[in-house]
UniProtKB/Swiss-Prot annotation:
Component of the ESCRT-I complex, a regulator of vesicular trafficking process. Required for the sorting of endocytic ubiquitinated cargos into multivesicular bodies. One of its GO terms (molecular function) is SH3 domain binding. It comes from the Eukaryota. It comes from Danio rerio (Zebrafish). Belongs to the MVB12 family. Pfam families: DUF2464. This is Multivesicular body subunit 12A. One of its GO terms (cellular component) is cytosol.
Length: 275
């Protein structure tokens, strides 16, 4: 197996299994070492044996980025976990040395563990493989390298969904949201103003009435007593003796205005165009 071959599927999980019957279906059980010896990690005849197995099923979306063999007194690193056990009822795995792995999403890395091998202790070497350590008389080796993530497969669509998408009946339009805070009520208009704003027909458009004023059509002219001041070129000096203090009644009498002209202008009837 070459490291340069990027088409190799990476290892997605590792575990312990008593035999092929307890080993999950998508796992491969390592029954023999590279030098032909039995890969049973249990040396006794009374105890049930257990084997190292691995999987390359990527349906779970995870891959093994690294493998470590640590002692029972060692501390497992952050992001690592011990491999699961699929054993018979009375079987157990020795805890003197344990295998831990680091699982990562398949799309987050470009290199991962590609293969695992076992050899008998101090008897053979595996080219291009990394030695992880010895366990119960075996040496664990792993091969790391680049891999190509599987191409995403399109999910099958149901025919009913395709027919529904071709239907001419479009989805119902969304209903307008009702405001939680209704707009404030418009201010009340006085009786005189309401009469002036109404058109001759008696029907008033809200968009038009807001722009109508009682001063529409009334020409602007200055009072005669102010015309002499505006026409003179010399600025007259106002002394304190010219200031007259007026009472409230004098001001009301001077500026009293009945709006008679404006009422007549508002009541004017526009001539209708005869055909």
């Amino acid at each position: 197996m070459s490291v340069c071959d990027s088409s190799i599927r990476p290892v997605s999980a590792m575990a312990w299994a008593s035999n092929t019957s307890t080993c999950p279906g998508h796992f491969t059980l390592i029954s023999q070492t590279e030098d032909g010896a039995s890969a049973n990690f249990s040396r006794g005849f009374v105890r049930s044996g257990y084997f190292l197995c691995y999987s390359k099923d990527l349906s779970g979306g995870m891959v093994v980025a690294d493998v470590q063999v640590i002692t029972d007194k060692g501390t497992i690193l952050h992001g690592y976990c011990y491999i699961p056990e699929y054993l018979e009822q009375k079987a157990s795995v020795a805890k003197k040395k344990r295998v831990c792995v680091r699982l990562v999403p398949v799309g987050s890395v470009t290199t991962a563990v590609l293969d695992l091998k076992l050899t008998t202790k101090h008897k053979s070497m595996v080219q291009q493989y990394t030695c992880l350590g010895d366990m119960n008389g075996f040496v664990v080796w792993c091969l790391k390298g680049p891999f190509s993530p599987p191409a995403p497969q399109a999910k099958p669509r149901r025919v009913s969904l395709d027919i529904r998408s071709l239907s001419l009946d479009g989805p119902a339009p969304p209903q307008p949201l009702k405001p939680s805070n209704p707009p404030e009520a418009p201010p009340k208009v006085s009786r005189r103003r309401s009469k002036l704003d109404l058109p001759a027909g008696g029907v008033c458009d809200s968009s038009v009435c807001s722009g109508i004023s009682a001063m529409d059509g009334v020409p602007f002219t200055l009072h005669p007593k102010f015309e002499s001041r505006s026409s003179s070129t010399k600025v007259s000096v106002i002394t304190l003796s010219d200031i007259r203090i007026k009472s409230v009644q004098d001001i009301e009498n001077e500026y009293n205005y009945t709006f008679t002209v404006e009422e007549l202008a508002a009541k004017r009837i526009r001539p209708s165009l005869s055909g």
